[in-house]
Amino acid sequence: MRHLRLIATLALAAATGTGGASASADPVWVVSQQGAELARIEAGTVAGRIPLGPAPVAAAADRAGRLYLTHPDGRAVTVVEPGKPPRRLPVPGQAFGLAASPDGAHLFVGDWSGDRVLRISAATGAVEGTAAVGHEPAHLVLDRRGRLYVADRESRQVSVIDTGTMTRVAVVPTGEAPFALALAPDEASLYVANVRSGDLTVIDTATLRARATVPAGRMPYGVAVTGDGSRILVTNQHAAAVTVIDAARLEIVATVAVGPYPEGIAVVGPRAYVANWFSDDVSVIDLATWRETARIKVAEGPRTVLAPGEPAR
């Protein structure tokens, strides 16, 4: 499982956090894989901690504030609901990438070793359908039309799935080892971080074709987009930095130093939050100055950052 541990981060823009906080501020949720913990960050500090099962990886949320987390080694999904203890759903496969329907009825789970995506009931875990994809499906993103985009890491492609019929409707070639995905706010573009080729593939979601490839730093791993869609933020594991790309010109306009081995990233209003795997903390970036303004300690091995914002798709 060492290869999974080294690529186990997703940067997700998701629905509201639990606890009734407004979407204009925190909370920000941080998943620590080695520490098996979900931390809630509010007002620049850790305001709560939820113990999880071993090695949680990916996270998603629905409009009701329920959080979902995958455990590849445990073949399971943990469900965290406001006011209730976490519950566990068994998954018939190596659960890795994850997306949730906005109403929380369905979960879409990438089976890392099975080259497929499962649609399961979020209430019972019952399998409702499957779709074949490429090798080692990583990040999953669901759009407002019900199309699911899947980064097929070892197939150098993104699979596009109709979630109503659970059929693959398109395959889009990318760079080497696509891992993290992010949709533009208007969903006209999908940004794909390619780990081994050091670049970003930009996919036109209307034509389902790649329209550009952009250098994105040393080992780009996580990707997020600012709320106005003007900037794309990409973590660079081997540079301890975040590369900032102008979305209109598709040019690098800034580089922000963060902690060692940055992985997941999420944007919340005027700030971005970056999970630093090697230093067990989260960097806070001011989007006006493009500078790191704080580091927040969390449990060992932070991989995923889940932030409030647009509803989960």
Residue ranges and their predicted role:
Residues 5-313:
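Predominantly soluble domains enriched in secretory-pathway, periplasmic, or organellar proteins
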Residues 1-2:
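N-terminal secretory signal peptides that target proteins for export/translocation
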